[in-house]
Every structure is written in structure tokens, then in C-alpha cells.
């Protein structure tokens, strides 16, 4: 609480290319602070969905296309929980950056609406537009904005250098070819590592400038991916990882880097978690009052239900995994038995995370909840949440269906007095 925050959604990031020798800055950041051992990136592909989920603490409406995404819809919605808006209310200076053109996915609209003074490669950032562009150049062109402003500050970056295709026509792969040419990998894997080195160089420059400005010990750095690096074949990703990956679950294992510089010792968290959980966790850590009933993600450091959720509604918990594609339950060990009733409760719980999230964005629900001017959508019998003045830990889905605001078996029912179909769920 009170520290500066620099947050990254890193294009096609994978922790498997991190090493102390090749990427010392990423290695340090990923081994210092709060270590989330069982974090999974939710998405196979589509940057806008992964970025949306991280920024909103909600799942996107999966029926939408990339050009009509949930992020586009949210561009005119009331968004009180996004970090840009939430930290502005706490007196932070807030900045947002992307090293490609600003109207790609309409980030010039969506990111301003999240509370950021937003700059992109063609609007405020003096960098070369390439495919992909340089994360290092973006850092060099942006860091003075917030280091020269008053503290505290929050900066958000959507990176680009790690974008596929992974060959030597990729501008960043070609730039960093010499650094990887002797590595014992195939050409596509070397090209993947090469373009991702540009993120390492950007982070190295960031840390250098934080030290020079005297604020390194007051600045937290958080980083995760937007999606699995789908530009690599499964065989190439196995090669990068150095092991045969479980394609249903483990290929989604990723990093929620939460670098906190002045902890006396690292905090290790073994709860299962995924992309939507980052926002509520950071809101808690930075002392922002919020109502957890209105987010699909869960503060990973809180008590309650913890799971990693994937985009096809497969999920992982400490006791079992569920493959939604095959409707298969995989217990953590042979002594664990999952009843049909318990599985159904979990399955509906995950279904409703997606349903609630879609309805929130499609109806501009937060505007109704907080009595703000809405960009569109109408709801009857809504509840204004005026009873919560501090952080409140109750899973949003549990609140919604226990109080009749979601009918798990009727996807179109939201905001009215639906009859809950699911019994009590373990808190």
C-alpha cells in the first residue's frame, strides 16, 4: 500500500525462456516478492481477451469476435475497479502505454476509459512502428513521464515485442539474433526467445532508471501474459519447456510475477489462480476498497474458493482438475473422490463466472450499481450495493445466485428475481 506500481501484460510471454544467465532481470523479478506457484494464463490466444480479463477481473463474453470484443464494449462503460481509475481515486498519477498503433483493438479509447493517460506508437510515443515494435524503445520513450511526475504513480504496459511469427523476418527476433544463435534450440524457438529478449532489455532499462531516480525500493513490478504462445507448435513449446507438456492444463501454466522489493523474505502462495484473479489481488495489496461480489476473479491472498480457470471452462484446484472438453475429472491423488454433486457445484460455479462477467459488461452493470450515467442497457430490480464500505470477501457468483440475480440454467436472466438453482456451496 502506498508504493508505486508498474504493471505489464506481456505479449505471448512464457516463463520457460527465463534463466539467470540470459534474462537476469526477469529472473530477479520472478524470484523476489510474492511467488504464485500455481498460476495459469486463461487463454490459448486472442490478446484482447487476455488483456481484458487481467485489467477487469472479469471474463470476456466468449461469443464475441475480436473486432466486437468485450474490451470494445467496455470502452464506454463505467469501470470503477480498473487499476487506472481505482488508483487515481487514491491520488496516483496513472499512465498507459502500448508499442503499436493506438486504435488497434481501440486501445486509445478503452485504456483512457480505464483511467490512464494513454500513449501508443502513433500517438504520443516517439518510437518506430514495426512488426513487432520494440518494448525497449517504448520503455525509453515513456519512463520519464512518471518518474518526472509526483508520487505515487502507476504505469501500465501492453507489450508487443513477443508477437509471432517466430522466424528471422520478425523484426525483434532479427534484432536479437546474435544473442541466441548458439542456443541449443530449433530456429523457431530461438526466434521466440530472441524477440522476447526485447522485454528483458526493457525491464533492465526500467530498473536502471528506477534506481537512478531513487524510487526502486518503493516500486512494485507485476507482469503476466496475455495468452499462451500459440505461434509455437506444440512440439516447439515442449522444446522450449524442456519437457513433454500436458496440453489440456500444463501448457497454460505461466507467471504472475509480483516483485515487491523490500520484503524481509519471499511470500510463497500455492493456491491455484488465473488471469482474472490478478486485479482483486492487486486491489487488496494496494489498499483499494472494493466489493468482491462484483468481480469474477478472487483475491489469491484471501480465504475462500481458489481455482485456475481456463477459457473453455476447464479448471484446476488443489484436489482435482476438470477437463471441460472431455468432461473428465482428474483427482490430485488416488485417495480423493469427487462426488457428482461436488463436481456439478464447481462446474456451475465456473459457468456462472463467465455468465456474470458477460452480463456485467454487456449491460454496463457497474453504472447501474453505482448510480452513474450508463452507456446503454437496462436492468430491472437491480440492487445498489451501498452496504459495503471496505474490502468484502464473498465470491461474486455465490452472492449473485444465492440472492436470485443469476439463474445458472437460464443464460439470459440477469438483474431480475431469478430463482437460484444451485444449493449452498462451500465458502
Question: How would you name each of these model-derived features?
Answer:
Residues 1-379:
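Solvent-exposed soluble domains appended to multi-pass membrane proteins
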Residues 379-427:
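Extracytoplasmic Gram-positive cell-surface binding/anchoring modules and repeats
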